[in-house]
Amino acid sequence: MSDVVPVRNALISVSDKMGLADFAAGLSAAGVTIYSTGGTRAHLEQSGIKVEDVAEYTGFPEMLDGRVKTLHPRIFAGILARRDLDDHMDTIADHDIEPFDLVVVNLYPFAATVSRSGATRAECIEQIDIGGPSLVRAAAKNHGDVAIATSPEQYGDVLDQLETLGGTTDELRTQLAAEAFDHTAGYDRAIADYMQGDAVGGEFPASMHVSLRRKTQLRYGENPHQRAALYSDSSDRSANLVSARQISGKELSYNNLLDLDAALDIARGFAEPAVSVIKHNNPCGAATGDTLSEAVDKAMAGDPLSAFGSVIGMNRTLDEATAEFLCQPGLFIEAIVAPDFEAGAVGLLTTKPRWKDNVRLMQVGRLDEPARKVSRRFISGGMLVQDADRMVSSPLQWNTVTETPVDDDLWDDISFGWEMVRHVKSNAIVLAKDTSLIGVGAGQMSRVDSVEISIKKAAERSEGSILASDAFFPFPDSIEAAAKAGVLAIIQPGGSRRDDEVIAACDEHEIAMVFTGRRHFKH
């Protein structure tokens, strides 16, 4: 192929050394001379690979604690010289400069350092790479002659072409250059976001860049006629679905991912064993228990009909006892997300006659790291950004506003209901009993309609339950409906012009009411 450029000299300077020794060994076997610096050179030499020292080649030592290594004309001229221009080639020959045909660079882990708990400003600043981005941009600019690899994932493609073609093609070099510029753009954006956030004292930055990398193409979107793909956000260090390990099951769909994310978000909000059951991005069941199997039993009983074909989230390792419960006749589950799965549980879930290996099992790892701190949502012409709606209030900050007191036995259910209602589409109403969800009214334009739907779902179980509302009650009509259903206590933000009427209606029916002072709309 006429566009194949042979690789005779390679410059390697990387922070992430995953797969590097094997890659460099392949380059050496292909007759490539390798130049390298500092820790990268030491790593390669320890792996038995011959390496030329950049400091010896440039005649200038590394200095300033490694801040200056490759910033030298002998390096950059060798990268930027155009092979099709005689004066370029004559110039580097006059100065005894070797042309580099391959540059392998990945950058200091700035984003990882910034997201690490306890990282100091000095540590973050020290992870701002200078020479690396310069090398990457130089090689990417001259991609007509130079291949630039910025990720271990690219090593295989480069070696394949060296082995089969003796060099790199224009198509590969162009692709690598595009990925390189995307890499440095995201890197600089992360630094700017950090510096802007620091400068304005925690306000949202004046500009924001969303840097995402496509992980996989999905079969389709919410509907078969819509194209879809999944992109990863390297700045999200919490346990998440994009970096999760799929243990078994069919390919995840767009809707599966949305529902699994909602299921995980609910489960991680509880300290005790918790299970959430999601259908169309709303919970149709949820519960806590002394054990995971108790929690899943209670959660699935919340709305058994809707739970068919649902996805489930858990905040504990899925054990065999829980798996045995899920394998009972009549249950069908699309997917399960959990920190981990016992081997016996996987065996049960993947050999159930009706399921076989179709159920998708997603292992996300420990839930120690908090979930994302901000939420982002695209609208026409821009993006909305807000703090994530995390629960920071506690019963100590709440206020019982009725003369009717809250029975001590109801506080666990009240706290559970208040945690759950923020996960339901507004107008949102939930009924809870025995720390389990027994009725959900979601997404209605009228609050009283949501109340009536939740009561209908709970049926006779509503007797002795508590009701949680994501926003205030504009009229007492919802209280009348709750009283007929046997609700004993209601928790809501308060703030209506008719709060007095609502409170009076509660006292009339001997229902306790708690104000939290915090609304939890979800649109």
Curated annotation (Swiss-Prot):
Coiled coil: none annotated. CDD domains: IMPCH (cd01421). Its EC number is 2.1.2.3, 3.5.4.10. InterPro entries: AICAR_Tfase_dup_dom_sf, Cytidine_deaminase-like, MGS-like_dom, MGS-like_dom_sf, PurH-like. Keywords: Hydrolase, Multifunctional enzyme, Purine biosynthesis, Transferase. The keyword Hydrolase applies. It catalyses: (6R)-10-formyltetrahydrofolate + 5-amino-1-(5-phospho-beta-D-ribosyl)imidazole-4-carboxamide = 5-formamido-1-(5-phospho-D-ribosyl)imidazole-4-carboxamide + (6S)-5,6,7,8-tetrahydrofolate; IMP + H2O = 5-formamido-1-(5-phospho-D-ribosyl)imidazole-4-carboxamide. Gene3D superfamilies: 3.40.140.20, Methylglyoxal synthase-like domain (3.40.50.1380). Residues 1-150 form the MGS-like domain. It comes from the Bacteria. SUPFAM superfamilies: Cytidine deaminase-like (SSF53927), Methylglyoxal synthase-like (SSF52335). One of its GO terms (biological process) is 'de novo' IMP biosynthetic process. Disulfide bonds: none annotated. Pathway: Purine metabolism; IMP biosynthesis via de novo pathway; 5-formamido-1-(5-phospho-D-ribosyl)imidazole-4-carboxamide from 5-amino-1-(5-phospho-D-ribosyl)imidazole-4-carboxamide (10-formyl THF route): step 1/1; Purine metabolism; IMP biosynthesis via de novo pathway; IMP from 5-formamido-1-(5-phospho-D-ribosyl)imidazole-4-carboxamide: step 1/1. One of its GO terms (molecular function) is IMP cyclohydrolase activity. Belongs to the PurH family. NCBIfam families: PRK00881.1, purH. The IMP cyclohydrolase activity resides in the N-terminal region. This is Bifunctional purine biosynthesis protein PurH.
